Amino acid sequence: MKTSFLAHSVAIVRSNFKGLLFTACIVIFAMYLSSVQSIKDTTHLAATAFAIIIGVLLSPWFFKYQHHFQAGVHFSAKKLLRLGIVLYGFNITLTELLSVGLKGFLLSAIVIFFVFIIALFVGTKIFKLDKETSMLVGAGSAICGAAAVLALESSLKSDPFKGILAVGTVVIFGLVFMFLYPIAFSLNLFPFFDQNAMGVFMGATLHEVANVAGAAEMAKDMAGFEQGASNVAVIIKMMRVILLVPFLLIVTYFFAKNQHSSSGKTAKSITIPYFAFAFLGMIVLNTYLASKESILGIATSDIISLGKTLCTLCIVFAMAALGLQIDFKKFLKSGSRVFGLAFVLGLVLIFGGYFLTLAFKGILW
């Protein structure tokens, strides 16, 4: 048993080695750029953003020699991606989720539901996009950015290029909003918002967890944002992240059911996102580890830190691989419509999120 497992592992490494090595070079450079303080202070870009940018710039070269690297790049975009999503559970504990309460859960669920439904309608009816692309952009805008896009793409087994387009939009609009929110709040452009309300608004409407953390940090410098308000923002965002699990199950089920009824496919086309359950299990494990000081002589804080580092590494690998697979001809042909949909959803998040936050003001805290 051990021998066969080892042989299988060696076979995987051999078949994917060139592509993994090539992707690893991009990952190392991306993580280096994100660690340089002057670059970090200027751009506020995470390693994930640098990875996809570098990947995009190198994509013409990759397509020229893809027969050498395709297997490893595909492995990074699929297998390492799922592992990264599972390990994302090391960023969340059940205690943090419960601290938000039922009303925080309700706010997050409303945002996800309406943004996704609007994405599906506007994307297919107005921008004439296919259903899968509309769903991917909607998931990225509604839940947790690139991680949600990639998780849904993996569940639906859709064309990777659709995921690449969707990831591009959520990365760009997430960064724009990350800078926009603190500036607008410092200029008092959000009437009736105190710091806690702004924290809820950030957590309920920003695309990525990194966007929420970045916006809250900038708000500290620009508007004297207190730590309590920053915590509210992150916790509300984490509630949206945890809702990724039921979201994947529900959407995958209905999408497969619709495909079956319209095209006569068998039930085998239904893909159960087991990694979503593993993600939930990792949250439970992280909660347990956080409650202990050490296990078998090893500090639990070190285990959690390792889990977070491996999560980041896997996601950065996946982002680099996705960037490499961008076909500029296809991108120029359909990218503008995808960005149009993401822009509309951005407006929905800003204005809809503003009024929703006001509606919940006084109940959430």
From Swiss-Prot:
InterPro entries for the chain: UPF0324_pro
UniProt keyword list: Cell membrane, Membrane, Transmembrane, Transmembrane helix
UniProt-annotated location(s): Cell membrane
Topological type in the membrane: Multi-pass membrane protein
Main location per the UniProt record: membrane
Segments traversing the membrane: 12-34, 44-63, 83-100, 105-127, 134-153, 163-185, 197-219, 234-256, 269-288, 303-325, 338-360
Keyword Transmembrane found: yes
Keyword Protein biosynthesis belongs to the record: no
Annotated Pfam families: Cons_hypoth698
Coiled-coil ranges per UniProt: none
One Gene Ontology cellular component annotation held by this UniProt entry: plasma membrane
Family: Belongs to the UPF0324 family.
Protein name: UPF0324 membrane protein Cj0999c
Source organism (scientific name): Campylobacter jejuni subsp. jejuni serotype O:2 (strain ATCC 700819 / NCTC 11168)
Lineage of producing organism: Bacteria, Pseudomonadati, Campylobacterota, Epsilonproteobacteria, Campylobacterales
